[in-house]
Amino acid sequence: KKKKMIDKLKYAPLKVHLLPDDRFLATHAEFEAWAEGRKALRMEYFYREMRRKTGLLMEGDQPAGGKWNFDHDNRKAAPEDVTVDGPLRFDPDATTREVLELVEVRFGDNFGALEPFWFATTRAEALQALDHFIANALPRFGDYQDAMLNESEFLYHAILSPYLNIGLLNVTEICEAAANALPQDTRRSTPPKGFFFF
């Protein structure tokens, strides 16, 4: 779908320049070069390349913890009496309220709901959300990353993707913050691979 949209730009009345998106660890060209000639695109192997490229979750040329994948260890059921803070929530300021009202008026028939709106809207708030996740959820995220509870819609998940998508945070600072937050012995035994998605 994206490629079709880009192809249509060739016929635009103005000259269009596509700029690289620095919100990702890999460029389109890097991914295409990796994917070329492969019968199946198993992302696990691409993630390994990204680890080698960045040095994240690596000890020299070997994966931290001695293996590439800890998925089997990350499938524990969450205890029923677990207490979870959840993601950091923010009260919308006057400007955000004004935008929410405008969206409701102009796009009220679109799918989804505007309320409750508790997301960060500034870089400072997004950094607070990252710090909150690192301090309160990351230590237990790995064990329970696939767990679900009726009482907790997010459990230990970060809910940082919106801030990546709109450029309030960048992927490198998030990965480095997570890697640096864990004690060295924890990093070796169960690094936060699932949180990194590689």
Segments (PLM) and residue ranges:
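Catalytic cores of enzymes that engage adenine nucleotides and/or redox cofactors via long glycine-rich
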Residues: 73-198
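Beta-rich, aromatic/charged-enriched effector core domains that present basic-aromatic interfaces
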Residues: 2-118
